[in-house]
A protein has these predicted regions:
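Polytopic alpha-helical membrane-helix bundles and their juxtamembrane interface segments
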Residues: 1-176
Length: 176
């Protein structure tokens, strides 16, 4: 779905030659792309939940809490300082929430598999999720400040995130 999101974004920008509306069809695909990934990771995590020790669960909860606090400390002041329509506010807020859910699943899974043979791909996946959190926060910050442009630093961070996700899935495939 993220391929469809990127394709629709490119269609607006390169084919139609217009500023990409926000929210747009691309946002439907970006947001929709999280759902199968989160469902799959949730099912994967659920399968191995019995291997989670209380100590590791506590550590994972602390890390997720810190990540959530940092993300919200940057997002909420910027979002509430703007005079947004309800649709824009919901769209702006859903990205960090979904990013944090993805990161949380990665951290919880890493807490289960840490020290094991398949921990490497979870580290990479967590890095990709972290890059997504950073890129989305930076995007929202730039849009709020009126400094966003296509091809900026946030877009490079997204591309790096895609690359790290691909590397994670490649590493996981090589483990079997």
């Amino acid at each position: 779905m993220w391929v469809l999101a990127e394709s629709s974004w490119a269609f607006y920008y390169f084919v139609l030659g217009v500023q990409v509306p926000y929210p747009s069809l691309a946002d439907v695909f970006y947001i929709g792309g999280y759902l199968p990934i989160i469902a799959g990771l949730g099912a994967y995590l659920w399968t191995f939940r019995v291997a989670m020790s209380m100590r590791r669960l506590g550590f994972a909860i602390v890390v997720v809490g810190i990540a959530t606090s940092l993300a919200m400390a940057f997002v909420l002041p910027v979002e509430f300082a703007k005079n947004l329509s309800l649709v824009n506010l919901v769209t702006d807020m859903i990205y960090p929430v979904l990013d944090l859910v993805l990161l949380s699943l990665a951290i919880l899974s890493l807490a289960i598999f840490y020290g094991g043979s398949i921990a490497k791909w979870w580290v990479l996946f967590g890095m990709g999720a972290t890059l997504y959190v950073i890129a989305d926060e930076f995007f929202l910050y730039q849009v709020a400040g009126g400094t966003y442009y296509n091809g900026g630093l946030d877009d490079l961070i997204f591309l790096l995130g895609y690359s790290v996700f691909a590397l994670a899935f490649y590493a996981h495939r090589k483990e079997f």
